[in-house]
Regions:
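Alpha-helical transmembrane segments and immediately membrane-proximal extracytoplasmic
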Residues: 1-497, 501-515
């Protein structure tokens, strides 16, 4: 049989190369870009907080002016130009994965949203807000990978879902330098399932993003390595149980506050949010500044420095620190600006560990702090496996793995008595069916009241955190509720994203109260 001519081999090789590139190269390139973006974003946030600290050291009272001003500006810019960038970003990713990615990703994972997420979270940390960068990094990673779908000639829902999942997991892994946590996070929190076909893609993306992060930052653990000693204390089991209950109650109350804003926030403030959301944001900024001054500046920022200082013994904090930090954290999320809750939750948990050390004086303080960190994080996220894997990798605490697992499990169960899973509940808002159209006159009047986003932006904008507030006890008659809805009809852009796919579960009582 004669050999084919050499020129005839080139088209076959070209087609094979393109097929290999589309099958593997896009994921590899995306993972590398996600790792690079995570490192650069972390450095930007760190620089922003150092700038805030330098300004505060120059003038202690400056946050009273700076924080409200930045809060107002951030909310105005978010609502005007970057609807979909609010909050941590993880609910947006979950909503995209649980529905048709092409429909939800086109609104929640665009490059415009990515830019707004980075920009406004930087402004938030520059103003001293109690926000983290890890949650936003998840949305940034998912958005970067999702936008690579255009390299596929025939993109489908399966490819898009794999891109989003791999980008989100790689983003979390690169943000914390915790590769195992990235895998567990994708399985437990994002999809609640395991696909053998997607596992190879997921692990490859995490490896490549992690290699980039390690190459730029070096091999490190997020909180360093703690010393647990050669022998565990006799009261370790009691300490695990008490810590899990305390942090479970605290984390559950935090989730309840975010998901039931209409039940505890005064009516005047709710009305202020509906009519003047920018003014409401300025008041939240003022509250953050006042709490920060009362705490001596320890509640500003994500809390990473405070948590690490407690772990290595270089810092002493008041027993009121975790409560003040919780107040600042709630005030940071009520306005609806971009920002994560992972790092602040770890800081609050460290504060509770420091508080409980007054009870368990014979225990190692770093050990107790590690237990409290995993307990509070598990209570807030209600993802116990992800929580203990994250903390275990961050402190290199393999010796504590059983204690961390037990604390995370008990704490997440205690938290569920107070509130449902936070991220899943927030994701349901994006999956909820659209609000029926209102009369043009009512829509115009409502638009004049909010004065935030033009009606033509409605299809690209998810719901606002405090819009269409309602009690969940069902005591209000349907007719009265309909009349009240007509009287206080939100603008079209406040109605939430139009659910274009029937795969998204329709929830009648979606979380309209929190961000």
């Amino acid at each position: 049989m004669p050999r084919p001519a050499l020129p005839s081999l080139f088209p076959a090789l070209t087609r094979r190369s393109l097929r290999i590139w589309r099958q593997y190269g896009v994921f590899w390139l995306g993972a590398i870009v996600v790792g690079l973006a995570a490192v650069l974003y972390a450095r930007l946030i760190d620089w922003g907080y150092e700038t805030f600290r330098a300004m505060r050291d120059h003038a202690v009272w400056l946050p009273l002016l700076l924080t409200p001003a930045i809060a107002a500006m951030s909310v105005w810019v978010t609502r005007r130009f970057f609807r979909g960038a609010e909050g941590s970003g993880i609910p947006q990713v979950i909503a995209t994965l649980h529905a048709r990615p092409s429909a939800f990703g086109a609104r929640l994972l665009t490059l415009r949203i990515l830019f707004g997420k980075v920009l406004i979270s930087f402004l938030g940390i520059l103003g001293g807000f109690t926000i983290g960068r890890e949650g936003p990094t998840v949305q940034v990673g998912a958005a970067l990978m999702f936008n690579l779908r255009r390299f596929y000639p025939r993109s489908n829902a399966q490819i898009e879902r794999q891109l989003v999942l791999a980008g989100a997991a790689a983003g979390l892994s690169a943000a914390f330098n915790t590769p195992l946590a990235g895998i567990v996070f994708a399985i437990e929190e994002l999809t609640r399932s395991f696909s053998a076909r997607a596992s190879g893609v997921l692990i490859t993306a995490i490896i490549l993003a992690g290699v980039v992060a390690l190459g730029l930052n070096g091999n490190y653990t997020y909180f360093g390595t703690i010393d647990t000693g050669l022998h565990f204390p006799k009261l370790l089991a009691v300490a695990v149980l008490v810590t899990a209950i305390v942090t479970g109650i605290a984390g559950g109350l935090f989730c309840w506050l975010l998901l039931n804003t209409g039940r505890w926030l005064p009516g005047q403030l709710l009305g202020l949010y509906r009519e003047r959301p920018v003014t409401f944001a300025a008041l939240c900024g003022l509250a953050i500044a006042v709490v920060g001054l009362v705490s001596g500046g320890t509640t500003f920022g994500s809390g990473y420095a405070e948590a690490r200082g407690l772990l290595d013994g270089s810092q002493q904090l008041s027993v009121f620190y975790p409560f003040l930090k919780m107040v600042s954290m709630v005030a940071s999320y009520l306005p609806g600006i971009p920002g994560g809750i992972f790092a602040p939750s770890l800081s609050i948990g460290a504060g509770f560990g420091n508080l409980l050390h007054a009870v368990f004086t014979n225990m190692s303080l770093p050990m107790l702090i590690a237990l409290a960190m995993v307990g509070y994080l598990a209570a807030v996220t209600q993802s116990p496996i992800t929580s203990f894997v994250i903390v275990m990798e961050m402190i290199n605490g393999h010796a504590l793995v059983i204690s961390l697992m037990a604390t995370a499990l008990v704490s997440s169960r205690v938290s569920r008595f107070f509130a449902p899973p936070l991220y899943e509940t927030l994701a349901q808002r994006y999956l909820a069916p659209p609000v029926p159209a209102v009369a043009p006159a009512a829509a115009t009047a409502a638009s004049n009241v909010t004065d935030v986003t033009e009606p033509q932006d409605a299809n690209a904008a998810p719901a606002d955190p405090l819009d269409t507030l309602r009690d969940e006890d069902g005591s209000e008659p349907a007719a009265a509720a309909a009349a009240d809805s007509a009287a206080h009809a939100p603008a079209p852009h406040d109605a939430g994203p139009a659910a274009t796919d029937a795969n998204g579960p329709a929830q009648q009582h979606g979380p309209r109260d929190a961000q």
